[in-house]
């Protein structure tokens, strides 16, 4: 089973992402274990390389998603990180 971390400070967006994941599971007859985190700091405190995919908001209180991703990459070069944002100016930076 693939493990997904949803790191998003907005409850509404977290709920939407869970809905999309459940829909994908049904359409593809697969299963994911999705775990929500409200802050990047909370996620970083427990992350030890045990997620396959990280859905990461960029604008959050405390450590932002870009800085969190840099810290994650120091521990885990293989995990898939997908940034979630509605701010276009972050689009290019997310690929660095």
Show where each model-derived region lies.
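Non-catalytic signal-transmission and effector/linker regions of two-component phosphorelay proteins
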Residues: 1-3
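Short, hydrophobic beta-strand segments that form beta-sheet elements in well-ordered domains
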Residues: 35-37, 83-84
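Short, glycine/serine-rich, charged loops/turns that create anion-binding
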Residues: 11, 41, 88
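Helix N-cap/capping motif at the beta->alpha junctions
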Residues: 36-42, 65
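CheY-like receiver
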Residues: 45, 51-96
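Two-component/phosphorelay signaling modules centered on CheY-like receiver
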Residues: 11-35
């Amino acid at each position: 089973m693939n493990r997904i971390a949803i790191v998003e400070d907005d409850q509404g967006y977290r709920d939407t992402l869970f809905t999309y994941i459940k829909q994908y599971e049904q359409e593809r007859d697969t299963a994911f274990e999705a775990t929500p985190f409200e802050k990047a700091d909370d996620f970083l405190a427990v992350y030890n390389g045990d997620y396959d995919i990280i859905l990461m908001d960029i604008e959050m209180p405390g450590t932002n998603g870009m800085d969190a991703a840099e810290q994650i990459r120091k521990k885990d070069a293989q995990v898939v990180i997908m940034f979630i944002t509605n701010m276009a100016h972050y689009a290019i930076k997310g690929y660095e």
